[in-house]
């Protein structure tokens, strides 16, 4: 499934946010965390709870994983939980800012500030 088509379906109201994440997870190699990252970067919604964030907030990584046999109902529940968790932790903007700040602190020779981290990611996207 094409990412841009899926994003268009969401923006036009054809699908809701949990289904957007589920459809993005149909792309090989994409799970909820990366789907949340795609939504964060393209729509300013959800967020990316990568391994660093999961550890920081004490969340088990398997909580948001799908397998080949995961039913739609379970995927939907996990997607809803993922969205709710991101919101509970402060939302997309807060998670982005905190992640950029952490990355800048962990890699001071690569990044001058959290703003530099953010700018590099925007540059990669052509934004």
Q: What name fits each language-model region?
A:
Residues 2-127:
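C-terminal accessory module of base-excision DNA glycosylases/AP lyases that mediates lesion recognition
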């Amino acid at each position: 499934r094409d990412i841009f088509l899926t994003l268009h379906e969401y923006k036009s109201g054809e699908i809701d946010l949990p289904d957007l994440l589920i459809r993005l997870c149909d792309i090989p190699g994409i799970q909820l965390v990366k789907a949340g990252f795609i939504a964060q970067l393209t729509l300013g919604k959800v967020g990316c709870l990568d391994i660093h964030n999961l550890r920081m907030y004490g969340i088990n990584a398997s909580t948001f994983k799908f397998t080949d046999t995961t039913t739609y109902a379970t995927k939907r529940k996990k997607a809803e939980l993922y969205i709710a968790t991101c919101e509970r932790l402060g939302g997309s903007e807060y998670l982005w800012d905190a992640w950029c700040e952490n990355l800048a602190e962990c890699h001071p020779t690569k990044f001058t500030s959290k703003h530099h981290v953010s700018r590099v990611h925007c540059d990669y996207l052509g934004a």
